[in-house]
């Protein structure tokens, strides 16, 4: 077994969603049905139990109410490829995952961003589900915007195209953020395994 010492080796991108499929999701989540369900993204502060934005009014909006069996299956298949194929040689000491969260939709309008953070997600665990986030799964639904670059490790711009799903460990060693959108609207989703 060969260990991978460059953290970038743990970041994998898969082109798994067709442009038409991505467009169909954007059409659904942009419909009047979901308009009231979008809310400002916040970060949980474990020290005092509060939720707050780190970018003030420039924080993105999120939609948790969207559910799609087809998208769940795409996410599941991509996690499987990452964990059981691309990192199959780690199976002897890494037991994979116990489940994954339903994808949460992200919408970045002009000027909106996501502050630098790592994915220590506390809200996933309500007493029934137990564990820690192990993998972060990001999907990009469009690319007809400017700005909105996905950055890892403080300053590394990750190539990310419409229809791509990117997976990386949900660890403090993988800080990431999205730069402010300059034109258009950026649509993506995120899920986590535990």
Protein language model regions, located:
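Fe(II)/2-oxoglutarate oxygenase catalytic core
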Residues: 1-165, 173-194
């Amino acid at each position: 077994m060969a260990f991978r010492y460059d953290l970038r080796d743990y970041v994998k991108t898969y082109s798994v969603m067709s442009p038409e499929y991505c467009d169909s999701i954007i059409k659904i989540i942009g419909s009047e049905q979901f308009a009231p369900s979008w809310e400002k993204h916040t970060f949980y502060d474990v020290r005092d139990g509060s939720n707050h934005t780190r970018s003030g009014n420039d924080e993105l909006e999120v939609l948790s109410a969207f559910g799609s069996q087809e998208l769940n299956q795409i996410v599941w298949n991509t996690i499987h490829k990452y964990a059981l194929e691309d990192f199959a040689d780690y199976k002897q000491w890494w037991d994979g995952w116990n489940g994954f969260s339903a994808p949460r939709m992200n919408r970045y309008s002009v000027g909106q961003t996501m502050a630098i953070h790592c994915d220590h997600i506390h809200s996933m665990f309500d007493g029934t589900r137990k564990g820690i986030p192990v993998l972060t799964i990001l999907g990009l639904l469009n690319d007809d915007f400017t700005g909105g670059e996905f950055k890892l490790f403080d300053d590394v711009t990750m190539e990310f195209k419409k229809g791509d799903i990117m997976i990386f460990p949900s660890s403090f060693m993988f800080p990431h953020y999205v730069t402010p959108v300059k034109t258009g609207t950026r649509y993506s989703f995120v899920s986590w395994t535990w």
